[in-house]
């Protein structure tokens, strides 16, 4: 391929590319471009056309212009008003810019012009035929190019000219056209163009299919419209009503019968008017119909009549649940007030207690006792505010919130509405559902609760809301303030036994297809299951164990191994395996540095053993067992107090300087925190530093201060019941927790002895077994040591005998 060097003025093109053999009009308005054309006209009318990389650039530089362009001849020049000119140019040949001679007052470049020489072999012929065929198909489908163009293209013998003319007729991007222009080799250019035309064919075919589909849809819509208009005319002649008018009249009739509040009725009628003006097939019409259906399905004025019979309600509650005195009493109080005050708003109760104690099922029993509808929604894991208030109708697939959905499910405006697991809600970027619940659970506001979907106030003041939670400290304070909290503690052993006999056994026997004649389980056997196979505040695991016994019984009967099965304490292991827990004392022997404490979690109470040991070192204290900051600080406070009382306790000062102290609380994988183990850790430290053993049948709880005072703690009932389960006989509690002993069942108090203390000295006097404390100068009797203590008084040392508890010697 031969080439020659030429010096020509340069005309930068914006948004257009000129191929060789292409004739086109160009409107020129930039000063540099006009001067370049005028220079070409003065010389031999030859000019170099190159396209800009970015059409938006008004003052292009060397880097803004493609290097390869087209040498063209200016055929005509016409000056237009406004200082612009229009030129007719014809492309001659490809050329490449070798260098820019100057850029002012116009671009002038030295270009290398390519002349095309080729040998028309079989490959070139095949590519030409393929390209011509594809171009013919493209022209037929696109209908953008005159058919005459195909005739002129078919007769071309020069492959380069064929490619350039076809490329000039295609609607390609500037980048793709430039790619073809830069293909100097004939075969390369033909191959590229074949690929481009094939791709364009696919696009044109897709466009054709889309156009056909759209046209058919339009024809269908027009046909439907025409037929509907005809149907309207026919109905009018026959005196029949339009379907849309009939639908709207039906909605109006239903609204008038529904006894809506005034505001809701106005809103519904307004939506009916909107529906009447819409085309029946409009998407918005479906949204309005759905909205009206929701409005009509809500119980605006429907309510059930309460069964205000306290005795009957008590019978229902007692039949369904054993124990749970406080919530049952609150329900009967509500009934009594309802009988006297007819317009009383529904109470908002929050049942707080460990899992498995019957909080959720109690809500269902309350509804049965009041003869009301019952609705339950679980709030566990809810983190979207729209779950409570609903979505606005502007969203696709919008629905009311779960409160309004629950009211529709209930079908009455005064159901018992249970909000389960209210402490398990979360919040994120979508909002805070607990804040949305503030309006629902506020008696002063919920009479005008507004859902985003309904957009009109709905009265919730007659609803009896009951919420449940395992841990009330996880509930946001403003929300907790709106509810009446009722604490439900774990069941006692006797309560579990009665629940198993009255409820769990009959239920599981029936569920497993057995009869009472087929299986017998004694009370002692159930007690053994409670004591040695479960350790929980509720009865869920107990029910699972009873279910396991029933399954194995059913298997034996079906297999023909027995007609009747009797489960006793001797053969219980055949049904449940080896006991999982040891029932009896928490520790079997009196030991130095080992003390039983009491803990309270959201799943109930438990006992924990605190171990302390010493070894030679530098006086450091180590704490292990995954303890929280509060618990570590409590241990430090106890250690500081013991160190300050070393002389009175008979502890050598070297123990604090040359011996290290290690405090460990077993089950190290479980996080522990809180101040209630303060006196327990202090007692264990005093024991190991004095060498005095601690009673194994004793448990204690209480916070300690640097002065040795014992402060009150929470969860006393749960802690005491856990200690009772572990076989503890004597419990040490802060004196300020005396009021909490009233919550402990009488039968539990009869089996325990309680010591109420105000100071750690009293704790040590009770817990440490040796009778004398050796001072560095004098030996004091225990009583004398206690009386010499300025923190101790006769009132402080009082011992509370609870329901037959025996007094231990001090």
Curated annotation (Swiss-Prot):
It catalyses: Hydrolysis of proteins in presence of ATP. Its main location: cytoplasm. SMART domains: AAA (SM00382), LON (SM00464). It is an enzyme of class 3 (hydrolase). Gene3D superfamilies: 1.10.8.60, 1.20.5.5270, 1.20.58.1480, 3.30.230.10, LON domain-like (2.30.130.40), P-loop containing nucleotide triphosphate hydrolases (3.40.50.300). Its EC number is 3.4.21.53. Belongs to the peptidase S16 family. Homohexamer. Organized in a ring with a central cavity. This is Lon protease. The lineage of its organism: Bacteria, Bacillati, Bacillota, Clostridia, Eubacteriales.
């Amino acid at each position: 391929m031969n080439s020659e060097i030429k010096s020509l003025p340069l005309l930068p093109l914006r948004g257009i590319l000129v191929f060789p053999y292409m004739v086109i009009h160009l409107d020129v308005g930039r000063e540099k471009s006009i001067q370049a054309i005028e220079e070409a006209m003065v010389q031999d009318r030859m000019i170099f056309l190159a396209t800009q990389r970015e059409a938006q650039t008004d003052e292009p530089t060397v880097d803004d212009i493609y290097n390869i362009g087209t040498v063209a001849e200016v055929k005509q020049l016409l000056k237009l008003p406004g200082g612009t000119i229009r030129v007719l140019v014809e492309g001659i040949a490809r050329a490449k810019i070798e260098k820019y001679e100057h850029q002012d007052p116009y671009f002038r470049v030295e270009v290398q012009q390519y002349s095309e020489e080729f040998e028309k072999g079989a490959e070139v012929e095949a590519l030409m035929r393929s390209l011509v065929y594809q171009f013919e198909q493209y022209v037929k489908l696109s209908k953008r190019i005159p058919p005459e163009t195909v005739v002129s293209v078919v007769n071309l013998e020069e492959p380069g000219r064929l490619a350039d003319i076809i490329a000039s007729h295609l609607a390609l991007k500037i980048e793709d056209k430039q790619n073809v222009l830069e293909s100097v080799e004939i075969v390369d250019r033909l191959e590229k163009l074949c690929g481009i035309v094939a791709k364009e064919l696919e696009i044109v075919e897709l466009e054709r299919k889309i156009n056909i589909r759209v046209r058919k849809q339009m024809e269908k819509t027009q046909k439907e419209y025409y037929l509907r208009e005809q149907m309207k005319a026919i109905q009018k002649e026959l005196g029949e009503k339009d379907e849309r008018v009939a639908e709207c009249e039906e909605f109006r009739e239903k609204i008038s019968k529904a006894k809506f509040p005034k505001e809701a009725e106005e809103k519904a009628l307004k939506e009916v008017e909107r529906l009447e003006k819409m085309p029946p097939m409009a998407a918005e019409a479906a949204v309005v119909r759905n909205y009206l259906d929701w409005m009509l399905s809500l119980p605006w004025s429907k309510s059930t009549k309460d069964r205000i019979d306290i005795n009957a309600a008590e019978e229902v509650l007692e039949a369904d649940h054993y124990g749970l005195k406080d919530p049952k009493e609150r329900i009967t109080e509500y009934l009594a007030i309802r009988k006297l005050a007819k317009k009383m708003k529904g109470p908002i109760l929050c049942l707080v207690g460990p899992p498995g104690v019957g909080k959720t099922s109690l809500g269902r029993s309350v509804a049965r006792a009041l003869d009301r509808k019952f609705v339950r929604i679980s709030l566990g894991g809810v983190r979207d505010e729209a779950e409570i208030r609903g979505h606005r109708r502007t969203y696709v697939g919008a629905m009311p919130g779960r409160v309004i959905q629950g009211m529709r499910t209930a079908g009455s405006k005064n159901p018992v509405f249970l909000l389960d697991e209210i402490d398990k809600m979360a919040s994120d970027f979508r909002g805070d559902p607990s804040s949305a619940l503030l309006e629902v659970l506020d008696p002063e506001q919920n009479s005008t609760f507004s859902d985003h979907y309904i957009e009109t106030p709905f009265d919730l003041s007659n609803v009896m809301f009951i919420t449940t939670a395992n841990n009330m400290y996880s509930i946001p304070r403003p929300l907790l303030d709106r509810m009446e909290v009722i604490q439900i503690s774990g069941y006692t052993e006797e309560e579990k036994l009665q629940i198993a006999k009255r409820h769990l056994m009959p239920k599981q026997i029936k569920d497993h297809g057995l009869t009472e004649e087929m299986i017998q389980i004694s009370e002692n056997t159930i007690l053994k299951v409670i004591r040695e196979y479960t350790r929980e505040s509720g009865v869920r695991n107990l029910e699972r164990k009873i279910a396991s016994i029933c399954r194995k019984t059913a298997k034996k009967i079906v297999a023909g191994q027995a007609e009747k099965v009797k489960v006793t304490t001797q053969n219980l292991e055949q049904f449940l395996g080896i006991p999982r827990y040891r029932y009896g004392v928490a520790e079997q022997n009196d030991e130095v540095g080992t003390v039983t404490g009491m803990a309270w979690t959201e799943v109930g109470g438990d006992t924990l053993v605190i171990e302390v040991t010493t070894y030679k070192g530098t006086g450091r204290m180590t704490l292990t067992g995954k303890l929280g900051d509060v618990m570590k600080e409590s241990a430090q406070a106890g250690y500081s107090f013991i160190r300050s009382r070393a002389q009175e306790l008979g502890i050598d000062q070297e123990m604090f300087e040359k011996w290290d102290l290690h405090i460990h609380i077993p089950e190290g994988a479980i996080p522990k925190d809180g101040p209630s183990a303060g006196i327990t850790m202090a007692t264990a430290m005093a024991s190991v530093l004095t060498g005095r053993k601690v009673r194994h049948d004793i448990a204690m709880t209480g916070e300690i201060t640097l002065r040795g005072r014992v402060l009150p703690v929470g969860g006393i009932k749960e802690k005491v019941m856990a200690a009772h389960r572990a076989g503890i006989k004597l419990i040490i509690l802060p004196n300020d927790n005396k009021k909490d002993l009233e919550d402990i069942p009488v039968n539990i108090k009869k089996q325990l002895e309680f010591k109420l203390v105000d100071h750690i000295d009293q704790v040590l006097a009770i817990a440490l077994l040796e009778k004398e404390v050796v001072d560095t100068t004098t030996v004091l009797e225990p009583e004398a040591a206690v009386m010499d203590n300025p923190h101790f008084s006769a009132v402080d040392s009082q011992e509370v005998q609870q329901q037959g508890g025996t007094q231990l010697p001090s």
